Regions:
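Catalytic-domain carbohydrate-binding cleft regions of carbohydrate-active enzymes
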Residues: 1-285
């Protein structure tokens, strides 16, 4: 329904993104969306392209649009303590807090805090940064990763949200995360916003949530599991669902068994609401 989406972990430079899209065009293979994954940014929580690797994102996106390709960008809800936005967000209570110990909720190449999208001011702040640094360059869609959120320390009793203690309200996190971008895009006049998100909760469908099944292994067993996952997502009221074609990790592109799996997963993907290729393939050169 939404065409074919090209994605991988990850495109490291502007030139790499354009090289892939141009090759699709040369081969006359239809491409609807290309996805730029994580760590394209200067720092977690800056929500902007790293100019060293993406020196002219607007020119890149303009060329992609000329080819008929829309652009999706990965967003993480994490703010590193060295981010340009950390101090302001911390002072304004726009981040999830801990009621004891160090105020760090994730450690991923640094120490980070998660944004608190249950706070309306947080939703407005994050959307404004996305407007300034992504939408202004022409980015069409957002990939809302880490949406659970993925706490490094799972002592849930210590986390405090705007809406209350985590043990009482944490499940609403992915819905409010989706709402952040849905509301912003609606204000722009986009009639039916749709964004990819790694987690959902009751009511997420009202915020344009396209959920995918996460980082699943590249095996036939997990291909079979996708049938169950997709059906259950639909029964939960969320119609927009997809999976990583080929699975996310463990697939070697030179392995005939993986090549067979990839072909079969493509066949399955053609009947999903969104046909999206993604993964972290071996070998890593």
């Amino acid at each position: 329904a939404m065409g074919f989406w090209q994605c991988k972990l990850r495109y490291q430079t502007q030139d790499e993104v354009l090289t892939i899209a141009r090759r699709y065009k040369e081969l006359n293979i239809p491409l609807s969306v290309i996805v730029i994954d994580f760590f394209h940014w200067t720092q977690q929580g800056d929500w902007r392209f790293d100019p060293e690797y993406f020196p002219d994102p607007k020119a890149m996106i303009d060329e992609l649009h000329e080819m008929g390709v829309r652009v999706m960008i990965s967003i993480w809800p994490t703010v590193d303590r060295t981010s340009v936005n950390y101090e302001e967000m911390s002072e304004r209570d726009l981040l999830i807090r801990t009621d004891r110990g160090l105020n760090v909720t994730m450690e991923c190449w640094g120490m980070q805090c998660f944004i608190d999208p249950t706070n309306p001011e947080t939703r407005e702040f994050v959307w404004q940064k996305a407007m300034e640094n992504y939408r202004s360059h022409g980015v069409d869609l957002f990939w809302l990763d880490e949406a659970e959120p993925e706490y490094t320390v799972q002592d849930f009793d210590i986390y405090r949200y705007y809406d209350g203690p985590a043990n009482e309200c944490a499940n609403e996190y992915p819905a409010r995360y989706s709402q952040t971008f849905f509301d912003g895009m609606k204000k722009e006049g986009i009639e039916n916003p749709l964004n990819l998100v790694r987690c959902a909760w009751a009511g997420s469908q009202r915020y344009g949530a396209l959920v995918w099944s996460g980082d699943v292994p590249s095996t036939f067993t997990y291909l079979r599991y996708q049938l169950t996952a997709g059906l259950n997502m639909g029964l939960a009221g969320i119609a927009w669902w997809t999976a990583d074609i080929g699975g996310f990790h463990g697939g070697n592109v030179h392995d005939p068994a993986f090549q067979e799996l990839l072909m079969r997963w493509f066949q399955f993907g053609a009947f999903c609401p969104v046909m999206r290729l993604h993964g972290d393939r071996d070998p890593h050169y």
